[in-house]
Amino acid sequence: MSSPVITKIEITQYRIPYKDTATTGIGIYYEPGSSTGGPKLLGIQIMTNEGIAGEYISIAPGTLPQIDAIAPALIGKNPLEREWFYDTAKVVLRKQDKMGIGPMDIALWDFAGKYYQEPIYRLLGGHRKKLPAYASTLHGDKSKGGLSSPEEFADFAEQCMELGYKGFKIHGWDDGDVEREISIINEVGSRVGDKMDLMTDPCCIFNTYADALKVGRACDDQNFFWYEDPMKDGGVSFFIYRKLRQAIKTPILQGEHLHLVEPHVDMAIAEATDFFRADPEYDGGITGTMKIAHAAEGFGMDVELHIAGPAQRHCMAAMRNSNFYEMGLVHPKVPNPASPSEIYLGEYSDQLEAIGKDGCVDVPEGPGLGVEYNWKGIKKYAIAEFTYD
């Protein structure tokens, strides 16, 4: 039996406009009437001599130059040899952040699932069918009825709890106002803290350790589940996060901006975090994410996956040491722009209401990623197309 071979790779660069939302470049927030251009994203199709395509629609911006560097190496190769691709791409992209590996690896896993007629989670040995979810908000805004005040954040937390969510994560305003951040933590904590797990992610906005410490102590007062990426170092200074861990009792979650398994391991050895963050798009695909999960397991640590998507669901289904699926970014007034409905056909959804009363989301059961992409819709928003053969 001959091995499958990659014959062609097609990349579609597209941009779906944000409706009633805007961005500062740090975060996305609700702004009625606004229609700003979303980030330039990629649709990937890896064609083979088997007549089976590995597909993935990426939501991570800025990866095209890296994919352009690594895609030609895949032509003529066996798409099942994902470890070869992972190791080769790491070397090719050794001077970059390596975020181009993830989308391509996910497409290769999609091919493998279709080739073997199995969902990816089953190829990974996964068994979890129901994934507990938390609601992860858009950033704070200035529009009444949105998330314009601590009270509105707390109102939304109550709405999410009624929908079934087990946890709620705050993305506050992105201006670094410490007192306002603390006021959200206190309001949400006093309203739902005894009924939901609570988290906050300032998105690296605080200028000083002192600011991060003040907010961390507010998290302590409200018994928050974790405190994520507070400082403008971008979450990469192991020394200062070890100091922060020593100063507060709320667990620290770090790793979104490190990329791949090696710095995650270094961070654990430095005692700079309590939870790992991993993302199939950022961390070398499903291959790289599972390396992080297994490394964390060796340390007795948990891994929380970043943002929503089918690749995240398959990884989490194969991970013992993961607590929550991040349903983000959600808001009481607008759809989730981080996993837009326009890219899918069929029933798959990462919108606010796409959760069971048990507080869980399902793992796709179809071959590969188990989702059907709306390629016609993606082509509608296409900016450019690239072919490698």
Each PLM stretch: what is its role?
Residues M1-A53, P61, G102, E158:
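Non-catalytic terminal accessory/regulatory regions of metabolic enzymes
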Residues T24, E81, R217, N223, ...:
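Shared catalytic-loop signature of beta/alpha-barrel
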Residues D105-G145:
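Glycine-rich, aromatic-flanked loop segments that form ligand/cofactor-binding clefts
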Residues I6, G51, I70, M104, ...:
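Conserved, mostly hydrophobic/aromatic
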Residues K8, M47-Y116:
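Metal- or metallocofactor-binding catalytic centers and their adjacent structured scaffolds
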Residues K40, N49-A53, Y115-E118, L123, ...:
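Ligand-binding pocket scaffold of soluble enzyme catalytic domains
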Residues P4-T7, I11-Y14, Y18-T21, G33-P39, ...:
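Flexible C-terminal active-site loop/helix
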Residues K130-I248:
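Metal-dependent enolase-superfamily TIM-barrel catalytic cores that perform enediolate-based chemistry
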